[in-house]
Regions:
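Intrinsically disordered, low-complexity segments enriched in small polar residues
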Residues: 3-7, 17-18
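Cross-family detector of peptidyl-prolyl cis-trans isomerase
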Residues: 12-149
């Protein structure tokens, strides 16, 4: 399903803890699966692994997340809040993070876990980031929404 924001696919899971989605330990670092042998996506893709039941992340609110990020090209982790032992907070829709995060976290509910695949144009583009993320890299994140204020 395409939209003007470039989202081509949104998959929804059943609510957390239901019979079709086993209760996960949301206080553990998730695995991030990066497709192998497939070309990278050029659209934002959102896959809800767990649908939260709490407050919704909307533009203008401050969100608190835990996340793991990997590069599509090599499957290597480049960042994870879990490894630092602290969550990350930012103002949603305020341009404090890459566009793919602003668009990808919006609509999540507290307690949710979402895989967000971000094309270069919504990530770091041709410049890359700090020698850790290469130019024109597609990024794959698993994000847990911890809180909304």
């Amino acid at each position: 399903m395409a939209s003007s924001s470039g989202v081509v696919r949104v998959r929804m899971a059943a609510p957390y803890g239901t019979a079709t989605v086993p209760a996960m330990t949301m206080n553990e670092k998730p695995e991030v699966d990066v497709p192998t042998g497939e070309p990278p996506t050029y659209h934002l893709e959102l896959d809800d692994i767990v649908v939260g039941a709490g407050d919704e992340a909307v533009a203008g609110r401050t969100v608190e997340v835990h996340y793991v990020g990997k590069a599509w090209s090599n499957g290597e982790q480049f960042d994870a809040s879990w490894d630092r032992g602290s969550t990350f907070k930012f103002g949603l829709g305020k341009g404090q993070v890459i566009q793919g995060w602003d668009q990808g976290v919006a609509g999540m509910k507290v307690g949710g876990r979402r895989r967000i695949t971000i094309p270069p144009m919504l990530g770091y583009g041709k410049r890359g980031a700090g020698g850790v993320i290469g130019p024109d890299e597609t990024l794959v994140f698993v994000v847990d929404l911890i809180g909304v204020k």
